[in-house]
């Protein structure tokens, strides 16, 4: 009976994202798998800032990884049956777009539209800002956010992501546990069925293995 009540009451989760990430696009298109279990709050961050804070780099910044990663994205879109188109260049700066999403306190409808503009339409918002704003349901003359409070909000979101254990996107945080990557939806679902998972000996050991280098 207790398990039934737990299943019937979604718990809170935070989803950190940046529209630069095709894997975040693939994730949000599958988030319905979690809808009955987690009330997910989309939270925009600046991925470049998170990378700097965690001494990390994205595959798009590593020449040897780019072809493999991008071709894998094409395959995954086909596998998932999702429309998908790369922008003419990638990566690109997403500061203005992420600030706008933070400023608007964007919920899922707007977040999905932002991702679709990049990964379905294949466009860089910086090159067609008025059109991007209209695509989100905003006025074409919406300015690129420059207010100190908006800048501070995006920075704060990014800092909170790091504090929550994120080092990349997409990352879903549940109960203080960070699940990174489009391939961790099943892991998150298993955790919800087995919330003591991270207290088990094997997980405790795996989380503390020292480096041999």
Q: Could you describe each region identified by the protein language model?
A:
Residues 1-8:
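Non-catalytic pre-domain segments flanking phosphatase-related domains
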Residues 4, 42, 46, 158-161:
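N-proximal short alpha-helices
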Residues 9-14, 20, 24-38, 113-213:
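C-terminal cap of thioredoxin/glutaredoxin-like
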Residues 19, 23-118, 202-212:
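Structural alpha/beta surface segment adjacent to cysteine/selenocysteine redox centers
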